[in-house]
Amino acid sequence: MDTNIMGFARALVDLAHEEDKVHLFYDNLKVVFDLVKENQDLMSLMNSQVLSKNQKHEIIDVVFKDHLTQTIVDFLKVVIDNREFFHIKSIIKKFFRMIEEEEHTIFINVVSAHELNDDQKAQLVEKLHKKFASQVKILYQTDPSLIAGIRIQSNDLLIDNSIDGKLKLLKHQLRTFSKEN
């Protein structure tokens, strides 16, 4: 593994502990990871040789300032200044793994179409604890666009048992089938 990736991830883990904001940093970095994963334009801008560091900093401020802690925004700027933004997904993944290993805990996002009751949450915690053989910390969110069902996501896992997810899968399968025939 690139020593820069490890170095940035270790520095971020240390900073998260120093500020006693491990879970907040984890959640913030999940937002960053999801955005850069889905938005190739942002990655292209941050890796551009045409834009100055200040211009890239301004873009980071516009995109993230209202959604992330200042420490994470500043961290992204340091990564840009060191011309390592093309590694940001790897840095964040390494951060996730280091935190999960240290805490012997898997952080999981659970998105459901409707708010889960306490019994449903307890059942989910028990099942996920057994599946991962580890402690789990769950962030619950609701998203009515799922129509019904649930989406479970951790660092390396996505289980989409929502109607929306099944419809998207069906749409993909139909497109693939129509291209083959």
From Swiss-Prot:
The keyword Cell membrane applies. Gene3D superfamilies: N-terminal domain of the delta subunit of the F1F0-ATP synthase. Belongs to the ATPase delta chain family. It comes from the Bacteria. GO terms for cellular component: plasma membrane; proton-transporting ATP synthase complex. It comes from Mycoplasmoides gallisepticum (strain R(low / passage 15 / clone 2)) (Mycoplasma gallisepticum). It is found in: Cell membrane. Keywords: ATP synthesis, Cell membrane, CF(1), Hydrogen ion transport, Ion transport, Membrane, Transport. GO terms for molecular function: proton-transporting ATP synthase activity, rotational mechanism. F-type ATPases have 2 components, F(1) - the catalytic core - and F(0) - the membrane proton channel. F(1) has five subunits: alpha(3), beta(3), gamma(1), delta(1), epsilon(1). F(0) has three main subunits: a(1), b(2) and c(10-14). The alpha and beta chains form an alternating ring which encloses part of the gamma chain. F(1) is attached to F(0) by a central stalk formed by the gamma and epsilon chains, while a peripheral stalk is formed by the delta and b chains. F(1)F(0) ATP synthase produces ATP from ADP in the presence of a proton or sodium gradient. F-type ATPases consist of two structural domains, F(1) containing the extramembraneous catalytic core and F(0) containing the membrane proton channel, linked together by a central stalk and a peripheral stalk. During catalysis, ATP synthesis in the catalytic domain of F(1) is coupled via a rotary mechanism of the central stalk subunits to proton translocation. This protein is part of the stalk that links CF(0) to CF(1). It either transmits conformational changes from CF(0) to CF(1) or is implicated in proton conduction. PANTHER family: ATP SYNTHASE DELTA CHAIN (PTHR11910). Its main location: membrane. It is a peripheral membrane protein. It holds the Pfam family OSCP. The keyword Transport applies. NCBIfam families: ATP_synt_delta (TIGR01145). This is ATP synthase subunit delta.
